[in-house]
């Protein structure tokens, strides 16, 4: 089988893996600018609405990332093309797992930070999530800095991930991107 035939026959991700990937991706791409907007908005109903939206999406992401991690651990990703150099394989693995870890930690830090403030964690106006930390304003302030830096890290690593996917599609012309798009 030629390399081109092998690339064309390479298996794609399952429909569930693709759904989880793209749902998390869209929410993360919404959260990055949303986080920066609310950090630079000064009071008023718009800021409160955006904070509540941010918290609701964060809670949703926490649940989806846990589901995604469990699914990934029980349904491994298809192998990368065999001609990808070892350093790129390592970079892909490190980038994926860094994103998983940060996307799991970030909403937890936000949840603890908000609980320690203390402020409610509304879920799309339906109900408030329970506080998970006692009031501690000093901790909340420190965690807000941690939350910021994790958010920046997620944005940088997501940009690397997107760049790598586009590199595979437009430069290498392999199926790495398409197997997450269409299987």
Tell me the role of every PLM-derived stretch:
Residues 1-183:
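Membrane-embedded alpha-helical bundles that constitute the cytochrome b-like, heme-associated redox core
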């Amino acid at each position: 089988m030629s390399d081109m035939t092998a690339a064309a026959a390479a298996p794609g991700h399952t429909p569930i893996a693709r759904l989880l990937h793209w749902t998390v991706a869209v929410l993360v791409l919404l959260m990055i600018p949303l986080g920066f907007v609310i950090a630079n908005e000064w009071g008023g109903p718009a800021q409160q609405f955006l904070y509540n939206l941010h918290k609701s999406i964060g809670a949703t992401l926490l649940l989806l990332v846990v589901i995604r991690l469990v699914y990934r651990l029980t349904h491994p990703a298809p192998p990368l093309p065999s001609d990808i150099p070892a350093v790129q394989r390592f970079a892909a693995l490190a980038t994926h797992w860094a994103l998983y870890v940060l996307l799991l930690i970030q909403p937890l830090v936000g949840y603890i930070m908000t609980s320690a403030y203390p402020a409610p964690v509304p879920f799309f106006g339906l109900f408030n999530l329970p506080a998970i930390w006692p009031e501690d304003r000093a901790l909340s302030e420190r965690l807000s800095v941690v939350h910021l830096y994790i958010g920046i890290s997620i944005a940088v690593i997501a940009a690397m991930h997107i760049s790598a996917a586009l590199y595979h599609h437009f430069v290498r012309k392999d199926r790495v991107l398409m197997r997450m798009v269409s299987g």
